[in-house]
Amino acid sequence: MFVLASASKARQKLLDQIALRHKVIVSDFDETQLQEPDPILKVKLLAKGKADSALKKLIEENHALNTYQALLGCDSLFEFKGEIFEKPINKEQLISRWKRMSGQSGFLHTGHYLISLDNSKSDMESISQNNSCEGVVSTKIEFMNLSNFEINKYASTSEPYNCAGGFAIEGNGGLFIKKIDGCFSNVIGLSLPWLKNNLEKYGLSRLLLDR
């Protein structure tokens, strides 16, 4: 079985979509402690932090070595003109950002940290360092020109406040996206092509389409 180190419902739905049976373990990693201005490095470190936190929980519960085959930590952020847009903290910030994003483009970066749970190793450091791979997948997103009415109406819904950049491409936010250049599932929360390629790397493609 597969472990997803994320509470994101969108990521869970992506795994359900490809019939990847999984257990969710929400990490205790404190994202606020990471003050990194570079978006690519930051999202990579966040993904690793989440994965390592979930791995620690598994080891403490004595499950990692006999129950699960792989663990994935993910995190996403939106980069707009060199500035990092994470989840909006309030309606005012969301509206302000959308007024800037309207008719413009930016990049959705998702960091991935995949750990193959090797039964021959018993400590966290050995497992995480010697049986892991990481990567950042970036998708360019171009937004439509939006009216103040549209922005305010979207900001009045609950959807954008749990999303990096303040939009959900798979939800109502998809109405405002003109086009993307890159991986679609990456914008939702994780790159399925990246996951498939790296599960194959560890001989774990059998976990996919396990209906």
UniProtKB/Swiss-Prot annotation:
GO molecular function: nucleoside triphosphate diphosphatase activity
InterPro entries per UniProt: ITPase-like_fam, Maf-like
Chief location: cytoplasm
Keywords from the UniProt entry: Cytoplasm, Hydrolase, Nucleotide metabolism
One GO BP: nucleotide metabolic process
Location relative to the cell: Cytoplasm
Domain of life: Bacteria
Top EC class, one word: hydrolase
Cellular component terms per the entry's GO annotation: cytoplasm
EC identifiers of the protein: 3.6.1.9
Needed cofactors: a divalent metal cation
The reaction(s) this protein catalyses: a ribonucleoside 5'-triphosphate + H2O = a ribonucleoside 5'-phosphate + diphosphate + H(+); a 2'-deoxyribonucleoside 5'-triphosphate + H2O = a 2'-deoxyribonucleoside 5'-phosphate + diphosphate + H(+)
Residues at the catalytic site: 75
Function: Nucleoside triphosphate pyrophosphatase. May have a dual role in cell division arrest and in preventing the incorporation of modified nucleotides into cellular nucleic acids.
HAMAP family reported for this sequence: Maf
Annotated family: Belongs to the Maf family.
Protein's recorded name: Nucleoside triphosphate pyrophosphatase
